[in-house]
Regions:
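A short, N-terminal "cap"/entry segment at the start of jelly-roll beta-barrel domains
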Residues: 1-37, 125-152
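A hydrophobic/aromatic-rich effector-binding and dimerization subdomain
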Residues: 3-5, 108-127
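Short acidic-glycine-tyrosine-enriched beta hairpin
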Residues: 10, 74-92
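Conserved short histidine dyad/triad with adjacent acidic residue
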Residues: 23-24, 39-54
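Conserved hydrophobic/aromatic beta-strand scaffold that supports enzyme active sites
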Residues: 38-42, 60, 76, 84-86, ...
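Short beta-strand segments in beta-sandwich/barrel cores
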Residues: 47-49, 66-71, 85
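Glycine- and acidic-residue-biased ligand/ion/polar-headgroup-sensing regions
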Residues: 56-58, 62-68, 73
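Ligand-binding loop in jelly-roll beta-barrel domains
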Residues: 69, 89-116
Length: 152
Protein backbone atom coordinates (compact mmCIF):
# COMPACT_ATOMS: atom_id res chain seq x y z
CA UNK A 1 0.00 0.00 0.00
CA UNK A 2 1.26 3.48 -0.84
CA UNK A 3 2.15 5.94 1.95
CA UNK A 4 -0.17 8.87 2.55
CA UNK A 5 0.64 11.82 0.30
CA UNK A 6 -0.06 15.50 0.89
CA UNK A 7 -2.81 17.02 -1.20
CA UNK A 8 -6.51 17.74 -1.56
CA UNK A 9 -9.21 15.32 -2.61
CA UNK A 10 -11.89 17.57 -4.10
CA UNK A 11 -15.48 17.63 -2.86
CA UNK A 12 -17.03 15.73 -5.76
CA UNK A 13 -14.11 13.41 -6.48
CA UNK A 14 -12.72 10.21 -5.07
CA UNK A 15 -9.29 8.66 -5.22
CA UNK A 16 -8.62 7.57 -8.80
CA UNK A 17 -12.24 8.56 -9.65
CA UNK A 18 -13.51 5.53 -7.67
CA UNK A 19 -17.18 5.30 -6.64
CA UNK A 20 -18.52 2.05 -5.15
CA UNK A 21 -22.04 0.68 -4.76
CA UNK A 22 -22.09 -0.99 -1.34
CA UNK A 23 -25.44 -2.40 -0.18
CA UNK A 24 -27.34 0.34 -2.04
CA UNK A 25 -25.14 3.14 -0.71
CA UNK A 26 -22.50 5.09 -2.60
CA UNK A 27 -19.00 5.11 -1.11
CA UNK A 28 -16.33 7.43 -2.54
CA UNK A 29 -12.82 6.86 -1.12
CA UNK A 30 -11.09 10.08 -0.05
CA UNK A 31 -7.78 8.95 1.48
CA UNK A 32 -5.89 5.68 1.81
CA UNK A 33 -2.75 4.64 3.64
CA UNK A 34 -1.76 1.69 5.80
CA UNK A 35 -2.70 3.69 8.91
CA UNK A 36 -6.10 5.04 7.85
CA UNK A 37 -8.79 4.95 5.18
CA UNK A 38 -11.62 7.47 4.69
CA UNK A 39 -14.64 7.60 2.40
CA UNK A 40 -17.68 9.77 1.79
CA UNK A 41 -20.92 7.80 2.06
CA UNK A 42 -24.39 8.55 0.72
CA UNK A 43 -27.23 6.52 2.27
CA UNK A 44 -30.47 6.81 0.26
CA UNK A 45 -33.68 6.51 2.30
CA UNK A 46 -34.29 2.97 3.54
CA UNK A 47 -30.68 1.76 3.17
CA UNK A 48 -28.65 0.32 6.02
CA UNK A 49 -25.57 -1.60 7.11
CA UNK A 50 -26.62 -4.55 9.30
CA UNK A 51 -25.00 -5.03 12.72
CA UNK A 52 -21.38 -6.09 12.41
CA UNK A 53 -17.99 -5.93 14.14
CA UNK A 54 -14.62 -4.69 12.90
CA UNK A 55 -12.11 -6.93 14.63
CA UNK A 56 -9.00 -5.00 13.62
CA UNK A 57 -10.13 -1.36 13.29
CA UNK A 58 -11.57 1.61 15.09
CA UNK A 59 -14.22 3.36 12.97
CA UNK A 60 -15.53 6.93 13.01
CA UNK A 61 -18.43 8.59 11.18
CA UNK A 62 -18.85 12.36 10.94
CA UNK A 63 -22.43 13.24 10.02
CA UNK A 64 -22.78 15.85 7.26
CA UNK A 65 -26.51 15.67 6.42
CA UNK A 66 -29.53 13.76 7.65
CA UNK A 67 -30.05 11.28 10.47
CA UNK A 68 -28.73 7.76 11.00
CA UNK A 69 -30.40 5.47 13.48
CA UNK A 70 -27.83 3.29 15.20
CA UNK A 71 -27.52 0.11 17.18
CA UNK A 72 -24.32 0.44 19.23
CA UNK A 73 -23.37 -2.55 21.35
CA UNK A 74 -27.05 -3.53 21.54
CA UNK A 75 -28.30 -0.03 22.45
CA UNK A 76 -30.38 2.14 20.10
CA UNK A 77 -29.18 5.67 19.39
CA UNK A 78 -29.07 8.19 16.55
CA UNK A 79 -26.78 10.81 15.03
CA UNK A 80 -27.50 13.95 13.00
CA UNK A 81 -25.48 16.57 11.12
CA UNK A 82 -22.42 17.67 13.09
CA UNK A 83 -22.32 14.56 15.29
CA UNK A 84 -19.35 12.20 15.44
CA UNK A 85 -20.03 8.48 15.87
CA UNK A 86 -17.17 6.59 17.58
CA UNK A 87 -16.98 2.83 17.02
CA UNK A 88 -14.07 1.10 18.78
CA UNK A 89 -12.94 -2.22 17.35
CA UNK A 90 -14.96 -5.25 18.49
CA UNK A 91 -18.05 -3.14 19.35
CA UNK A 92 -21.12 -4.38 17.42
CA UNK A 93 -22.84 -1.65 15.42
CA UNK A 94 -25.47 -1.22 12.73
CA UNK A 95 -26.41 1.89 10.73
CA UNK A 96 -29.90 2.61 9.38
CA UNK A 97 -31.38 5.44 7.32
CA UNK A 98 -35.01 5.14 8.41
CA UNK A 99 -35.82 8.66 7.21
CA UNK A 100 -37.21 9.86 3.91
CA UNK A 101 -34.13 11.97 3.18
CA UNK A 102 -30.62 11.12 2.03
CA UNK A 103 -27.86 10.84 4.64
CA UNK A 104 -24.33 12.02 3.83
CA UNK A 105 -21.38 11.33 6.10
CA UNK A 106 -17.63 10.88 6.20
CA UNK A 107 -16.29 7.55 7.48
CA UNK A 108 -12.75 6.69 8.46
CA UNK A 109 -11.06 3.67 9.98
CA UNK A 110 -7.70 3.12 11.59
CA UNK A 111 -5.79 1.11 10.58
CA UNK A 112 -6.98 0.39 7.04
CA UNK A 113 -6.52 -3.38 7.43
CA UNK A 114 -8.49 -5.16 4.67
CA UNK A 115 -11.50 -2.84 4.37
CA UNK A 116 -10.48 -1.18 1.09
CA UNK A 117 -10.18 -4.62 -0.53
CA UNK A 118 -13.53 -5.66 0.95
CA UNK A 119 -15.29 -2.68 -0.62
CA UNK A 120 -13.81 -3.54 -4.04
CA UNK A 121 -15.00 -7.12 -3.56
CA UNK A 122 -18.56 -6.17 -2.63
CA UNK A 123 -18.77 -3.54 -5.39
CA UNK A 124 -17.58 -6.14 -7.94
CA UNK A 125 -20.25 -8.72 -7.03
CA UNK A 126 -22.76 -9.30 -9.82
CA UNK A 127 -25.44 -9.43 -7.11
CA UNK A 128 -24.84 -8.36 -3.52
CA UNK A 129 -26.80 -11.15 -1.86
CA UNK A 130 -26.51 -11.27 1.93
CA UNK A 131 -24.86 -14.70 2.24
CA UNK A 132 -22.07 -13.80 -0.19
CA UNK A 133 -21.50 -10.38 1.40
CA UNK A 134 -21.28 -11.96 4.88
CA UNK A 135 -18.84 -14.65 3.69
CA UNK A 136 -16.61 -12.17 1.86
CA UNK A 137 -16.68 -9.77 4.82
CA UNK A 138 -15.53 -12.48 7.23
CA UNK A 139 -12.47 -13.03 5.02
CA UNK A 140 -11.72 -9.30 5.36
CA UNK A 141 -11.95 -8.99 9.17
CA UNK A 142 -15.55 -7.70 9.32
CA UNK A 143 -18.01 -10.05 11.01
CA UNK A 144 -21.74 -9.59 10.45
CA UNK A 145 -23.96 -10.65 13.33
CA UNK A 146 -26.88 -13.06 12.99
CA UNK A 147 -30.35 -11.48 13.04
CA UNK A 148 -32.12 -11.42 16.41
CA UNK A 149 -34.42 -14.37 17.16
CA UNK A 150 -38.04 -14.08 16.03
CA UNK A 151 -40.08 -12.03 18.49
CA UNK A 152 -37.03 -10.47 20.12
Amino acid sequence: MKPLTAGVTRANEGLDQISWNILGQTYVPKSLSEDSFSWHATFPPGTFVPPHIHTTQDEFIYMLEGRLDLVLDGQESFATAGDLIRLPRNVPHGLFNKSETTVKCLFWVSPTARLYDLFWGIHSMAEQNPADVVALSAKHEVDFLPPPPEGA
